[in-house]
């Protein structure tokens, strides 16, 4: 019997790229309206589950703060934090997930950096 070797990085990348194609909930970008609300200070992000992160976890004012969104491509958290004033870098293993962030940034005039790498 031959051992099957699975490359976890390649497997993860392919899975998340497919999720984007399928419209998975973690791959659906935020709306332009969500971005506009974030610009006005009315924002929230969800990291796991369905409940927004407690705002006390983050500074009251994100203006100029450096934020690393690790393994969080998909056009959700990074764009919202960028709209709230943070300098955002989104690091993810999926080119398509990062593409969602890039699409929102271009659509809504946001500055954020995306970095592709294994996670």
Model-derived segments and spans:
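Conserved alpha-helix/loop element of class I SAM-dependent methyltransferases that forms part
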Residues: 28-65
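Class I SAM-dependent methyltransferase SAM/SAH-binding core
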Residues: 65-119
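N-terminal, positively charged/glycine-rich alpha-helical extensions of SAM-dependent methyltransferases
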Residues: 1-37
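Mixed-charge, polar/low-complexity N-terminal
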Residues: 1-2, 6-8, 33, 42-43, ...
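Conserved N-terminal segment of class I S-adenosyl-L-methionine
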Residues: 14, 21, 53, 66, ...
């Amino acid at each position: 019997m031959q051992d099957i070797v699975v490359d976890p990085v390649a497997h993860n990348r392919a899975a998340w790229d497919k999720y984007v194609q399928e419209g998975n909930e973690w791959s659906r970008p935020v709306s332009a309206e969500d971005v506009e609300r974030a610009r006005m200070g009315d924002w929230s992000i969800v990291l796991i589950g369905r409940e927004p992160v407690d705002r006390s976890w983050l500074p009251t004012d994100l203006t100029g703060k450096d934020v690393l969104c690790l393994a969080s491509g998909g056009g959700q958290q990074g764009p919202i934090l960028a709209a709230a004033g943070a300098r955002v870098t989104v690091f993810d293993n999926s080119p398509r997930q990062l593409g969602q962030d890039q699409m929102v940034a271009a659509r809504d005039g946001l500055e954020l950096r995306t970095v592709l790498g294994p996670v």
